[in-house]
């Protein structure tokens, strides 16, 4: 029989055991919970039953936290050469129970047990065991984010205590896992080496992939929730860029497209304030690569929020995008086709940046954009370049209010009428560049109607 049945028939006996030896009884309850949860059972039912039993045996959440935290502190070695525990109740199991318990508590209860957690966090910050620090970071993140809903977090001393514990554990996790966080190889071969000095069991070892996923989904968003200082955010961002982004982007020579988890890291970093210096080079190098628009539609959608974040934080960079648009060939050493596609790509980059932005985000640069569009149309461009201008105008109609685009219409409408009139007299051949131009004009006309 598993936990629910044991609770029904043995509550009185457990209460007597709890009174005689709290520590051993707690170990037995947690061990029973862990064995049941690892079997093919209803996990949520087992979790709820365990927490209900603990609440029945104890008078407060503080007692549960104190007992489990004491058990963790007694097991955690101060260095990698510490004694290996042979009990099933390893530190990860105890941390998982506390994390489960913390998710069920409200902000008021979290405020009551935070002093206990604060003491545990300081103890964990002195160990060099990667998986212990990792689980301590997860628990601190869960409790810290919940604590923001309580009045206690508004007190400067408590807020600083939460922030310091959170940042310290985050930095320690990154430094202890170090280069094993490189996910570019697509395997977790480094995970055993991280823990080999202590000989942890497979259930104790946390793979670098799991660490990176936790950093993206839980830890990085918490920097904003916990109102961490920008200099500390920048420091953590720089570390993640060094250990994850740099090797990941260097290793994409085969398929060129970054791995999905690398995208997740980059997108998470772009959502943090004042961190663009740590990740902008990876975004810009990809964006200005000639292969950028050869990607799939899904990849283009994934890059959109990152491009938007970069140009939102550094709006002056749009001038660089506009400046790369040439009205005529200026390089004698490139082929006609290469020059043509380079000019088309430059215009499309402008369209892409504007499309990923918010409405009227680049009003200050609109006169410069208008000047460039007029110069292109007056230079009698190739049909593909000409067609790209009308795609760009459709994007402008989506991202600028109509009153800001009045300066474009005299030359745009004149060219559209001319092209349609010419097509009526001389129908373009199938699959020709001229047909592509007519199609682009027709789509803009349809959009205007």
Q: Model-predicted segments: where are they?
A:
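Alpha-helical solenoid cores of large eukaryotic proteins
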Residues: 1-108, 115-153, 157-360, 367-383, ...
């Amino acid at each position: 029989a598993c936990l629910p049945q044991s609770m029904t028939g043995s509550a009185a006996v457990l209460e007597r055991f709890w009174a005689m030896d709290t520590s051993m009884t707690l170990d037995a309850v947690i061990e029973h919970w862990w064995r049941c949860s690892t079997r093919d059972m209803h996990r949520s039912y087992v979790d709820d039953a365990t927490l209900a039993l603990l609440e029945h045996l104890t008078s407060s959440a503080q007692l549960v936290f104190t007992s489990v935290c004491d058990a963790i502190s007694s097991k955690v070695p101060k260095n990698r050469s510490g004694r290996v525990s042979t009990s099933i109740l390893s530190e990860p199991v105890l941390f998982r129970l506390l994390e489960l318990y913390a998710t069920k508590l409200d902000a008021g209860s979290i405020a009551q047990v935070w002093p206990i957690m604060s003491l545990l966090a300081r103890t964990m910050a002195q160990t060099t065991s990667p998986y212990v620090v990792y689980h301590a970071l997860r628990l601190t993140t869960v409790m810290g984010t919940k604590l923001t809903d309580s009045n206690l977090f508004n007190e400067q001393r408590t807020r600083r205590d939460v922030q310091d514990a959170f940042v310290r554990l985050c930095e320690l996790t990154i430094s202890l896992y170090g280069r094993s966080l490189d996910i570019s190889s697509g395997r977790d071969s480094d995970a055993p080496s991280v823990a080999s000095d202590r000989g942890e069991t497979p259930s104790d070892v946390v793979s670098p992939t799991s660490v990176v996923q936790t950093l993206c989904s839980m830890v990085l968003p918490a920097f904003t929730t916990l109102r961490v200082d920008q200099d500390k955010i920048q420091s953590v961002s720089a570390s993640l860029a060094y250990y994850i982004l740099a090797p990941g982007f260097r290793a994409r020579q085969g398929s060129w497209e970054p791995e999905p988890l690398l995208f997740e890291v980059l997108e998470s970093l772009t959502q943090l304030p004042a961190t663009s210096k740590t990740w902008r080079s990876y975004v810009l190098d990809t964006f200005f690569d000639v292969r950028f628009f050869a990607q799939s539609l899904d990849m283009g959608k994934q890059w959109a929020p990152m491009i938007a974040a970069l140009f939102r934080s550094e709006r002056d960079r749009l001038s660089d995008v506009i400046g790369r648009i040439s009205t005529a060939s200026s390089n004698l050493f490139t082929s006609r086709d290469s020059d043509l596609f380079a000019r088309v790509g430059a215009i499309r980059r402008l369209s892409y940046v504007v499309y990923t932005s918010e409405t009227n985000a680049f009003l200050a640069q609109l006169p410069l954009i208008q000047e460039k569009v007029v110069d292109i149309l007056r230079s009698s461009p190739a049909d593909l370049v000409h067609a790209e201008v009308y795609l760009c105008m459709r994007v402008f109609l989506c991202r600028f209010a109509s009153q800001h685009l009045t300066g474009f219409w005299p030359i745009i409408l004149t060219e559209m009428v001319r092209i349609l009139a010419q097509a009526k007299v001389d129908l373009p051949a199938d699959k020709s560049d001229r047909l592509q131009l007519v199609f682009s004009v027709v789509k803009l006309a349809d959009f205007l109607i």
